[in-house]
Structure formats: C-alpha cells, structure tokens
Curated annotation (Swiss-Prot):
Tree of life domain: Bacteria
Keyword Metal-binding listed: yes
Cofactor descriptive note: Binds 1 zinc ion per subunit.
Protein name: Methionine--tRNA ligase
Keyword Nucleotide-binding belongs to the record: yes
Residues the entry annotates as binding ATP: 310
Gene3D superfamilies registered for this protein in UniProt: 2.170.220.10, HUPs (3.40.50.620), Isoleucyl-tRNA Synthetase, Domain 1 (1.10.730.10)
Motif residue range(s): 'HIGH' region: 18-28
Record-listed E.C. numbers: 6.1.1.10
Name of the gene encoding the protein in the UniProt record: metG
Motif annotated as 'KMSKS' region, chain positions: 307-311
Length: 530
C-alpha cells in the first residue's frame, strides 16, 4: 500500500472509543473537552482537522450488562450510544466522526487488518491461562493483583481464572522495534511520567497477548476460525482507522488511510495507556503501517479529594453539571484548574469560586464597565484610537505582544491550564490598568486622547484574551467578539479567524461598530447545600 506523506495542513486526533456498559461519566467528558479544545486550536492555525470519537461496543462486560437487563447486546448498545452523542452536544463538542465498533464497515476493516497480521506470521493459537478482569477486558499478571484477587483498577471486582484456547498476537517479536521507536521518538508517549511507565513495563519483557475469546458471542468472529471471537481491544483500536473513511468510501484500509493517517494525537486516560502505547503500535508495525505521532495519557479525576464511584455515591453527573452551569463553565474549570496529565479534583465550592472570579469578575465585569465607559465618554460610542497610537512601552501592549506565541506553545503541549493562566494574567493586568489610569478622572480633566487610549488598550486586551480562550470557552469568546464589533462566532467553522492575525495585539480598529454591553457570564450564587 502506498501511503502518501500526510499534509502539514491536516490534523487528526481521537478521544478513546468509550465503553458503553453505562452512560458517560465525567472522566469521558474530561477527555472529550480536551480533545475539542485541541481541535478548535488547530483550526485557528488554519489546519483541516478531523476529531474522532465514538463507542467501543463489543466484549463480555457489555454482553453481561445486556443480559442482566434481559436485552440483546445490540439493543443495549443502541440505547446507550445516544447518551454520549447528546452529552457531546451539550458540551459543545464539534466532533467530525463518531465511530461505533458494531458498524458493518468496521468489520471489513478488522478482517483486512487481521489478514495482514496473519500473513506476517504474527498470529498463532495457544493456551491462555490466567486471571481475567471482565471490567478491563484484560488478563492481569498475578503481581498486579490486590489482596483477594481484586483488579488494581476495579478494586471492588474479583478477577476470574481462565484456561482456554485462544489466538495470540506475537507482541514479544516487537520488543526491540518498540524500544528503538520510543528512543527515536521521545515525544510519542506523553507526559513524561506516562512515558516512564511504558518504558518500565516494556523493559520487563513483552509477553504475547491473546486476541480472541471462546464462549463469547458478542463480537466479530475470527475470520478463519468463527468458533473464536476477536478480543475487544484488537477490534476497538482499529475503529480509529474505520473512522477515517468518508461516508461513500468502500471500507478498505487503502481508502481509510489515504488522507488522515497517521493520527496526530490519541488522547486517552492513563488506565488504557498500555493498549495505545504498546499493543497498538506493535499491531501497526506488524501490518506495515506508520505509527501515530503522539499518545497522551491524562490523569484520573476525584471529587472532594476522594475517588469517585457509584458505591460511594459521589459521582459527578456531567449532564446535570452542564445543565446547571453551562458548557463554557464546565469546560473552563476542568481545563484551567487541572494540569492535563496529572490527577485532578472536582470540588463544587472551588468550581463556583473559580468561575465567579475569572469569568464573571475579571473578564466579564472588565468588558462591561469598559464598554459602558466608551458609551459615556466617547462621541458616537466609538474610539478614534488605533494600535499605532499606543506606545510599545504601554503595560498591556507589552504583555500582549508575546502572548499569542506563549499560548500557542501551551496549547501545542496540551498545557491548557498554562494557556488559560497566561491569558488571565493579561485580563487581571487590564483590570489593574484601568483602575490605575482612572479614565473617569481623565475625562473630567478633558484629556480625551488619554481617555480613549486607556479604553482602547483595555478593549483590545479583552479581545485578544477572548480569541486565545476561544478553544476553551467558545460561547463566551463569541459573545465578547460580537460586543466588540466583530461578526464572528467561534462555533461556526466558516468564520475564519487566522491565528497569525487575531493572536496579535492591536487588531481592534477605530472603525469598529461596538455592540451593546451585555453580561457574558452571570455570577453564580452559591446555594447553602453546595
């Protein structure tokens, strides 16, 4: 297969394909919000972006969940999948492809890929003995287990002993190739802590892994031995490839891999790191395909410092959270307050405090009061000042000049908290600047040029902040842009706002038709039960 060199102008990224044994939880929402922010940022840079999400629908866990409700597995999946799609709509996620592992065209891709790996001599039949976690859909090594034969991830679940004939993938064959790849591509696994985990795991010696199950009806049959069902992970990882097909394409690897492959970024939770950073690249090497650019494993979420779980009754309902506070609020808190890659905590009191402080007070009040001053102090509700009138040593201009480059660097390494933090520094400096300069006092002294200079400088800084935060808070950013006289909606993909222009300080012109001041984020009143 001749794969063309992927264009610099394209960027493909994936969330995990979420397991549909239940409705989506806040952890799934977290990964997807991050992916959407990356996708929106890449679009600002002028790239064609493909954001892939979807659902992993095969396996024993789903079969058992369906049986417990007296339903067929497909019926069960068909009822759960819409809850993911509706949550993504609520969160303002602009995904391009939703890949379901039960899709007919996915089976064609899986069968073709299996045939390639079979022809490479990397699949054989053997006896599988070991402890199996149904929730992980994975065999566990004895040294990994907790007391009472419990899974280290699903601590309330006992693993099951299995002894059965399975097909295996020769993972051990790729030990050296993988180690050499990790060495020559140090950014492949991120952050550094995850990379070290993988290097440590691989250095202990890779074992061949089972890619089929017997006594399991729910999944694709092994192409040359239908008594066996393909292991959920062998099938699920390939759904990233299936998602690359255009709707009218015949489902072949050649068609799928033509434009978007290799994937630029796989975003995952750290619990599925091994599958994406070890098994997946080895499978691709076996099939003779280029490897993805980057796998980023983020941390887990806790609530009020405690691990979340249904048994503890302390889960965070993402649907309820968005319905109560709005999508921008939820996106902002999780991306700004948690260092992506580390574990993070949700606390509703802190959540409300952060939103009120950053969005309602610092950003919202600043825009509102400044626009009202323009209305009060400037003829025809317009500024006569332009960027050329502002000296380079102006406090806010000096801060704004390099801000775009700093924020770009932060977004590119998925440091959303840093991107938000440096933008907020400009907003806070703008609040201090307007208080220090006191345009109301300058107006009384009839120093009109200075009044307008102060107001221009602050409004331009708010504009720049809105633009740079638009991947995180697109609704609020759109509202700000429209109040500043730009007919731009950051949710409309046809509205072109090139980074090279809009990330520069000084874009606001003296011809702007400023909009009416409106609150961009209403202060949240804290109820007693929070």
């Amino acid at each position: 297969m001749n794969l063309v060199n992927k264009a610099e102008k394209t960027f493909a990224l994936t969330t995990p394909l979420y397991y549909v044994n239940d409705v989506p939880h806040i952890g799934s929402a977290y990964t997807t919000m991050a992916a959407d922010a990356v996708a929106r940022f890449q679009k600002l840079l002028g790239r064609d972006v493909l954001l892939i999400t979807g659902t992993d629908e095969h396996g024993q866990k789903i079969q058992r969940s369906a049986e417990s409700l007296g339903k067929a597995p497909q019926e069960f999946c068909d009822e759960i999948v819409p809850s993911f799609m509706s949550l993504w709509r609520l969160l303002n996620i602009q995904y391009d492809r939703f890949s379901r592992t039960t899709a007919v065209r996915h089976k064609a891709i899986v069968d073709e890929f299996f045939a390639r790996v079979w022809e490479a001599g990397d699949i054989y039949q053997g006896q599988q003995k070991g402890w199996y976690c149904v929730s992980c859909e994975e065999f566990k090594e004895e040294r990994e287990l907790l007391e009472g034969n419990r899974c280290p991830i699903h601590v309330n679940k006992e693993v099951e002993w299995r002894d059965e004939q399975n097909y295996f993938f020769r993972l051990s064959k790729y030990q050296t190739q993988l180690e050499e790849f990790y060495q020559s591509h140090p950014d492949f696994i991120q952050p550094e802590s995850r990379r070290n985990e993988v290097l440590n795991f691989v250095s202990q010696g890779l074992q061949d892994f089972s890619i089929s199950r017997v006594n399991l009806d729910w999944g694709f049959p092994v192409p040359n031995d239908p008594k066996h069902t393909l292991y959920v992970w062998f099938d699920a990882l390939l759904a990233y490839v299936t998602a690359l097909l255009d709707p009218e394409d015949e489902p072949t690897l050649e068609n799928a891999l033509g434009k978007w492959w290799p994937i630029n970024l796989h975003l995952i939770g750290k619990d599925i790191l091994r599958f994406h950073a070890v098994y997946w690249p080895a499978m691709l090497l076996s099939a003779g395909l280029p490897l993805p650019d980057r796998v980023f494993g983020h941390g887990f979420l806790t609530k009020d410092g405690q691990k979340m779980g249904k048994s503890l009754g302390n889960t965070v309902d993402p649907v309820g959270l968005v319905q109560q506070y709005g999508s921008d609020a939820v996106r902002y808190y999780f991306l700004k307050e948690i260092e992506f890659g580390k574990d993070g905590d949700f606390n509703e009191v802190r959540f409300i405090h952060v939103l009120n402080a950053d969005l309602a007070n610092d950003l919202g009040n600043l825009l509102n009061r400044t626009l009202n001053m323009v209305k009060k102090y400037c003829a025809n509700y317009a500024l006569s000042i332009t960027n050329e009138d502002i000296p380079a040593e102006n406090t806010l201009k000096a801060l704004g000049v390099d801000l775009g480059a700093k924020v770009k660097q932060a977004y590119e390494v998925l440091a959303f908290n840093q991107a938000c933090g440096v933008v907020l520094s400009l907003v806070q400096a703008s609040n201090k600047f307007i208080d220090d300069q006191a345009p109301w006092s300058l107006y009384k002294q009839e120093r009109q040029q200075e009044v307008e200079t102060v107001l221009y400088t602050v409004l331009e800084s708010v504009r720049l902040a809105a633009y740079l935060l638009s991947p995180v808070i697109p609704n609020i950013s759109s509202n700000i842009y429209q109040q500043l006289g730009f007919g731009i909606n950051f949710n409309e993909q046809t509205d072109i706002t090139p980074f090279a222009i809009h990330a520069q300080w000084g874009l606001l012109s003296n011809k702007q038709q400023l909009g009416q001041p409106q609150p961009i984020f209403k202060r949240i009143e804290q109820t007693k039960n929070v």
